[in-house]
Amino acid sequence: MNKKILVAPSLLSADFSILKDEIKKIEDSGADMIHLDVMDGHFVPNITIGPLIVEAVRRCADMILDVHLMIEEPHKFIKDFVDSGSDIITIHAEAYAGEGFKPYPALNNQGLRKGMSKTADNIDEGRVKEVLREIKSFGKKAGVSLNPDSPLCIEGVLEDADMVLFMSVHPGFGGQSFIEAVLPKIKALRKIYSGDIEVDGGINDRNAKSIIDAGANILVAGSYFFGAKDKSDAVKKLRG
């Protein structure tokens, strides 16, 4: 399946003190969309932005806003992110985990820390479908995401998902290394799913080809993009 390769620079790695300038760099680079990571300090061990910042980015950017909700109970905030100007809204399957939910691997009662992420062996498919359908009812694209250690447990919701996002690092912080174990899951999903497959975490010009070859067609790049002197060239190298 030949799908156009899209690049989505992540604002998580941007300098928020000059955010408008950073957005202009994305626009001028030839990238396809802007990726915004929303974190609540509970689902992941970091706090980032909310609807107010998404709305501010919307006012500055004439690009697709790809909003990734790494939060608990995302259904409570869908309308807020719709109203803020999101074009794509992605929720985590682990936010609606069923039996087999592992909230904090190797926790040892110390709280969710960097290098950990919530995992799920199965999900409440009905609940996930409801939220995906709600997102689409507003005319937005709906995505579902999986953390690196979660198995491919979303087959039952694919018909309602415009996009599947694989986290290839443990979510919460930028600058991490790509987790190779995600590649087989991308390959397995592509065999049964014709929609968009997005990958986020540790992506650069050295591993982009293997990710694309596995079946992904949207690459999120944070540290690699904002660390590049020539950002247009960085985007071209990711596309291959």
Regions found by a protein language model. Name each.
Residues 102-111, 212, 224-240:
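C-terminal helical cap(s) of enzyme catalytic domains, especially alpha/beta-barrels
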Residues 22-23, 73-84, 149-161, 203-219:
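Catalytic cores of alpha/beta
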Residues 47-68, 131-145, 180-201, 237-240:
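Alpha-helix-loop-beta-strand connector modules within alpha/beta enzyme cores
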